[in-house]
């Protein structure tokens, strides 16, 4: 198929699996020349390349297939990038790529046997295949890395799973703390959308409820806010809540599924040029094409963000230089995500190997002979793992706030504080 010819530049096909060339180097020699420590990192990635899809004049790939294929290749680029950095640091790493999508008869060209020996399995990306893969991956004892957003319920009873995309519920504290510290004198408006965001909106509201001593979760008794209920067709009386005599701060957790609310929010703000308005919004706002730069700039739009590259850091630039050498371009979102996830898993597996009961290494040996700080590090994604449920999987809880400032997204903490609001005559 056309996919096979396109993919040849990235990996070679086996009869049953897509097999990336094994990246191996000589066994790592640590500080003691008489001591050789061998660590081999085995990775399996299950990605939707649609390599079994037979393209004909009457059977063309859908837009969704093409998009998933694009994401798969980009993710593979990130995996290869991480593997190259691990190899360059002196470690053995083997990467095997399996086709996620079954053939026209619904038959997968991989089985549980293909997973045996894997330390880490990344993917699948699509819900149907993902659900079927959880038990086989658990049985072979591999860590299961999810690189797409999934329902948290999937983590129940699956301690071997790690979901790398931060759960949205963990950015609520960040927004609340920022408002309490910087906007406690402002007019706070909480624009709700209901629907799929209702649980998250309730969590946010709970943060500000006063306890029996008259304080909320953050020890404050002074902050109150207006609640405006939005719907698919309107943002309620939001326009009436914007005052010319006081800075207004609008908080909305509306996601892509409630894009009409965000569209109406933008329209209301832009039609009122006498009010100073700031906006705290869901991370999805950044991905909506109808949100214009003028709105982002005027409102100093602030979003929870994950995956920001520090382009001024020399170590980061060196790592990206490896990607540029491989692909003659800068890494995009899915390449960054899979690269960082694999490096995080590699470091965790290496430490587990060194400290396992079967290992003869003691703590002093690990600290002196293995300089763990010199391991290749992540580029954009920080990981702060939280076990979601008892005996359940882990979710990344790491978020930072990013503000649109001077026509670009900047880490909020790096931007100078706001001047006090001045009422103009």
PLM features: what roles do these ranges have?
Residues 6-425:
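Extracytosolic ligand-binding ectodomains
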């Amino acid at each position: 198929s056309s996919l096979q010819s396109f993919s040849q530049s990235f990996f070679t096909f086996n009869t049953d699996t897509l097999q990336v060339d094994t990246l191996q180097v000589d066994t790592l020699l640590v500080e003691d020349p008489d001591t050789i420590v061998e660590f081999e990192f085995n990775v399996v990635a299950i990605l939707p390349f649609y390599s079994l899809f037979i393209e004909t004049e009457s059977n063309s790939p859908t837009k969704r297939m093409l998009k998933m294929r694009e994401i798969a290749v980009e993710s593979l680029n990130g995996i290869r990038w991480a593997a190259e950095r691990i190899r360059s640091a002196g470690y053995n790493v083997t990467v095997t790529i399996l086709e996620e999508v079954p053939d026209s008869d619904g038959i997968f060209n991989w089985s549980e046997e293909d997973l045996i020996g894997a330390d880490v399995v990344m993917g699948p990306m699509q819900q149907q295949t993902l659900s079927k893969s959880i038990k086989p991956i658990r049985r072979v004892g591999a860590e299961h890395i999810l690189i797409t957003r999934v329902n948290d319920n999937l983590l129940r009873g699956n301690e071997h799973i790690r979901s790398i995309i931060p759960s949205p519920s963990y950015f609520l504290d960040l927004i609340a703390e920022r408002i309490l510290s910087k906007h406690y004198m402002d007019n706070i408006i909480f624009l709700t959308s209901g629907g799929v965001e209702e649980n998250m909106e309730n969590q946010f509201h709970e943060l500000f409820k006063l306890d029996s001593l008259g304080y909320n979760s953050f020890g404050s008794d002074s902050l109150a806010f207006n609640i405006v209920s939005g719907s698919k067709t309107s943002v309620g009386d939001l326009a009436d809540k914007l005052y010319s005599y006081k800075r207004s701060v609008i908080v909305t957790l509306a996601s892509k599924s409630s894009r009409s609310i965000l569209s109406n929010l933008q329209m209301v703000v832009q039609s009122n040029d006498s009010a100073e308005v700031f906006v705290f919004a869901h991370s999805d706002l950044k991905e909506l094409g109808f949100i214009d730069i003028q709105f982002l700039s005027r409102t100093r739009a602030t979003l929870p963000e994950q995956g920001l590259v520090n382009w001024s850091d020399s170590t980061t630039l060196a790592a990206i230089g490896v990607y540029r050498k491989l692909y003659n371009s800068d890494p995009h979102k899915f390449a960054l995500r899979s690269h960082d996830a694999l490096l995080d898993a590699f470091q965790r597996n290496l430490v587990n190997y060194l400290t396992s009961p079967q290992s003869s290494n003691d703590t002093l040996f690990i600290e002196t002979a293995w300089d763990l700080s010199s391991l290749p590090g992540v580029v954009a994604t920080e990981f702060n793992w939280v076990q979601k449920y008892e005996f359940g999987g882990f979710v990344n809880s790491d978020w930072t706030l990013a503000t649109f400032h001077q026509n670009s997204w900047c880490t909020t903490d790096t931007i100078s504080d706001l001047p006090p609001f001045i009422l103009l005559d």
